[in-house]
């Protein structure tokens, strides 16, 4: 499990996700709007929109909010025009960090992101400085209650690249182009997923502890707390014990 996934899991267990539900809703609504704008308003024909709608349902977002966000994206309702930008930089200990943003004010966002890096002993870099250290993949997370051998067989037959047996869950990795096909095959075979998304997987990990670990978690928390930031990917590895102590 990547450092970011561990961090998200612990945050969810401790209820931090619930405390920030308003921010979570804001980010999902932006993603639904942009996905509908780029690929149309039908989730069945738009994988990005389907993933965003699934996230909204998992967070118990009211159906009206979802439909309104889709209509803003397709132009049926008036909405804000968001620009997608990715910022890159380094966290404490040389950790590679990718920050995906959706903003209606590029100047505000770049200033906020740069300031956050600096305050947490990191620094923002040039475009391309760390993106080569990540691979774009489909990631489908399945509960440990599932039969691993059957999951492995169904996933690979549908075109998955790998199925990993992690500490808390099974993780099915796919190429982005086969993500929807694998996901649908798993659903048909009765495997309910805990999450399914296109994400950035780090090629190598940087082990952190002590002050560097503490500052890295602060950086993640502050970046994700920014309304303009949609996703943060980083290649840090902090032990579960240390992470639980620091959070």
From Swiss-Prot:
- Which GO CC annotations does the UniProt entry carry? cytosol
A Pfam family the protein falls into: Transcrip_reg
Q: Which domain of life is it from?
A: Bacteria
Listed A to Z, the keywords are:
Cytoplasm, DNA-binding, Transcription, Transcription regulation
- Disulfide-bonded cysteine pairs: these are none
- Tell where it localizes: Cytoplasm
One MF term in GO for this entry?
DNA binding
Record keyword S-adenosyl-L-methionine present: no
GO biological-process terms attached to the record: regulation of DNA-templated transcription
Q: Which HAMAP family match?
A: Transcrip_reg_TACO1
Q: Which family does it belong to?
A: Belongs to the TACO1 family.
**Any idea what this protein is called?**
Probable transcriptional regulatory protein Gmet_0743
Organism of provenance = Geobacter metallireducens (strain ATCC 53774 / DSM 7210 / GS-15)
């Amino acid at each position: 499990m990547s450092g970011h996934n561990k961090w998200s899991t612990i945050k969810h267990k401790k209820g931090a996700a619930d405390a920030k539900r308003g921010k979570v809703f804001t980010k999902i609504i932006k993603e639904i709007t942009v996905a509908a704008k780029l690929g149309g308003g039908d989730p069945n024909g738009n994988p990005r929109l389907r993933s965003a709608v699934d996230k909204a349902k998992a967070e118990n977002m009211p159906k009206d909010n979802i439909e309104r966000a889709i209509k803003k994206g397709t132009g049926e309702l008036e909405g804000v025009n968001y620009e997608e930008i990715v910022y890159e930089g380094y966290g404490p200990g040389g950790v590679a960090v990718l920050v995906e943003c959706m903003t209606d004010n590029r100047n505000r966002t770049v200033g906020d992101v740069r300031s956050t890096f600096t305050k947490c002993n990191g620094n923002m870099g040039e475009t391309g400085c760390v993106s080569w250290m990540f691979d774009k993949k489909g990631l489908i997370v399945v509960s440990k209650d599932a039969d691993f051998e059957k999951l492995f067989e169904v996933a690979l037959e549908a075109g998955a690249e790998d199925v990993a047996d992690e500490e808390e869950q099974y993780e099915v990795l796919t190429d982005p182009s086969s993500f929807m096909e694998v996901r649908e095959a798993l659903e048909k075979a009765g495997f309910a997923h805990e999450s399914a998304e296109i994400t950035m997987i780090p090629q190598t990990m940087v082990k952190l502890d002590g002050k560097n670990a503490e500052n890295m978690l602060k950086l993640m928390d502050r970046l994700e707390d920014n309304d303009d930031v949609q996703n943060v990917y980083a290649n840090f590895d902090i032990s579960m014990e240390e992470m639980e102590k620091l959070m």
